[in-house]
Amino acid sequence: YTTLFRSQLIYSKYKLSAPAQKLVTTVISLVQEEDESNKEYSILAKDFLELCGTKTNNREYLKDACEEIFTKPLKIKEPKGWLIVNWCSSIRYIDDQGTIKFKVSDELKPYILNLKNNYLKYDLKNILPLKSEYSIRVYEWLKDIYNSKERYNKKMIEEFEIEFLRERLIIPDSYNTNNVFTRVIDKAKEDLEKHTDIRFTYQALRKGGGNTFTHIE
């Protein structure tokens, strides 16, 4: 599977578990330009679990992921404000077929269809082995940065404010700055090196004259 969506989508504000992120990204990969607006997209539960390398056949695993996708909207930054939108308008699980059926929200479709520039494309095999929700998001950000800088032949260096990471990833307030490094950035670095086509190094920066790290590069 290859997924394609507008770069704006990956920098939106949302919090989904790793299984829910993998499931919704798999659904997005099925959407085609010529599809009818009310089309349902089907995924066999066993196929999805195999793709993720999950040995369990527990329906609760999928049920929880589906409920997350339906109940946790995303907040997309727009030129004049924000758009809060659900990933799907409906999710149906058919017991005897072991099939999950999704209807993608109409308001989300401009971010996944008819894309001519400023879009991200990657192979799903890179995120399916990842266990951390943060590692998946960091992979998508870095993949987008890599693609855009390669396109314009620029240096592969990017700077993020730690507060930006906290806001967009909805990192709990209980995570201090050190936790952000060890449980989010370092974990993502380890996961991406082991499972994906992205490698990165980083350094923490202090800006503004204080003793606290405020940025990473």
Predicted regions and their residues:
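Charged, alpha-helix-forming regions
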Residues: T2-E217
